[in-house]
């Protein structure tokens, strides 16, 4: 797309966010980015947790507890307004640095904003080593519609 139209500008912003190393940003940049990402989230459509079918309704099973509280989602995870989402992050926990890449790590970091990469970098610096496979960290969701936090 032409970078002068909305779609082109959005792709360019995403690509620049993807290659940006974690670092503090000018507050005015962050404010503008947050406005744009919130508008983009609204345009995609936010899915509230109450709209999600539970596994109890889809797969009746008496051996699984809390089937009326567990949902499976197939779609754009960045649209969900839920308590937490889980990202298949890499061991550096900094997100995907490939511009416009279609992986879930890139999608989450692109929808959350540069603050997520910054927070992940701070967590990893304090930890002092890469994240072992199968472990997770809890971060804020920033511009994701996820309610209180996002799990990585």
Model-derived features: where do they sit?
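Macrodomain-like recognition of ADP-ribose-binding/processing modules
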Residues: 1-152
């Amino acid at each position: 797309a032409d970078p002068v139209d909305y779609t082109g500008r959005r792709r360019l912003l995403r690509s620049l966010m993807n290659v940006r190393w974690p670092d503090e940003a000018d507050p005015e940049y962050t404010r503008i980015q947050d406005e744009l990402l919130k508008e983009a989230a609204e345009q995609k459509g936010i899915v509230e947790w109450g709209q999600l079918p539970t596994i109890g309704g889809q797969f009746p099973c008496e051996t699984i507890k809390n089937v009326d509280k567990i949902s499976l989602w197939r779609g754009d995870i960045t649209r969900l307004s839920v308590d937490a989402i889980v990202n298949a992050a890499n061991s550096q926990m900094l997100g995907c640095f490939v511009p416009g890449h279609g992986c879930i790590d890139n999608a989450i970091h692109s929808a959350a904003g540069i603050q997520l990469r910054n927070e992940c970098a701070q967590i990893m610096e304090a930890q002092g080593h890469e994240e072992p496979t199968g472990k997770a960290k809890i971060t804020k969701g920033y511009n994701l519609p996820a309610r209180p936090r996002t799990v990585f």
